[in-house]
Swiss-Prot record:
The gene is atpH. The keyword Protein biosynthesis does not apply. Gene3D superfamilies: N-terminal domain of the delta subunit of the F1F0-ATP synthase. InterPro entries: ATP_synth_OSCP/delta_N_sf, ATPase_OSCP/d_CS, ATPase_OSCP/dsu. It is a peripheral membrane protein. Disulfide bonds: none annotated. This is ATP synthase subunit delta. F-type ATPases have 2 components, F(1) - the catalytic core - and F(0) - the membrane proton channel. F(1) has five subunits: alpha(3), beta(3), gamma(1), delta(1), epsilon(1). F(0) has three main subunits: a(1), b(2) and c(10-14). The alpha and beta chains form an alternating ring which encloses part of the gamma chain. F(1) is attached to F(0) by a central stalk formed by the gamma and epsilon chains, while a peripheral stalk is formed by the delta and b chains. The keyword Translocase does not apply. Belongs to the ATPase delta chain family.
Length: 180
């Protein structure tokens, strides 16, 4: 999932700070917390409430992320607050994760199947893809019954469609073309 614009710039700045201070692993752990914070409707309501002063909001962030190790995470959140961009926190998290995967050489792969796969099958496919691509693979699976069978594999911008639906569509085109 590509994130553009302002959220990506915030993520790039946060990533640069985390990398400079050797905190990439720490930030990776904090991303889950930030994601939960961004999804929490009570937090959103509190942050968006104009009757609550900025200082009170900053104090809450200080309590949620205490200690010196959280300083840069806290700075990012306060900056988003001050600039009226809190609503972009989720996109910042997504963009940061993309940068982290890219930095670590991880390839994002989506596997779409007609039926759910067993976890052991998914893990076997992930290992095989990692071996063939000579890079670590983050494999996400989704189910689309309309495929009828087979798989669709999305690696970066490339799509490998070996679904029964596509094969039937191609066969139909060939038959119609031959009949014309």
């Amino acid at each position: 999932m590509a994130v553009a614009g302002v959220a990506k710039r915030y993520a790039q700045a946060a990533f640069a700070v985390a990398k400079e201070h050797g905190q990439l692993d720490f930030w990776e752990q904090r991303l889950t917390d930030l994601e939960a914070l961004a999804r929490d409707s009570a937090v959103e309501e509190f942050i968006q409430n104009p009757a609550i002063p900025l200082e009170a909001k900053v104090q809450v962030i200080d309590r949620l992320f205490p200690g010196d190790e959280n300083r840069y995470v806290r700075n990012l959140l306060v900056l988003l607050l001050e600039r009226g961009r809190w609503h972009q926190l989720r996109d910042v998290v997504v963009a940061f994760r993309e940068l982290l995967r890219e930095h670590r050489g991880v390839i994002d792969v989506e596997l779409v199947t007609a039926v759910p796969l067993e976890p052991s099958e998914v893990e076997r496919l992930r290992r095989e893809l990692a071996q063939r691509l000579s890079r670590p693979v983050e494999l996400r699976t989704t189910v689309d019954p309309e495929l009828l069978g087979g798989v669709v594999l999305k690696i970066g911008d490339e799509v490998f469609d070996a679904s029964v639906r596509t094969q039937l569509t191609n066969l139909r085109r060939q038959l119609v073309g031959a009949a014309a």
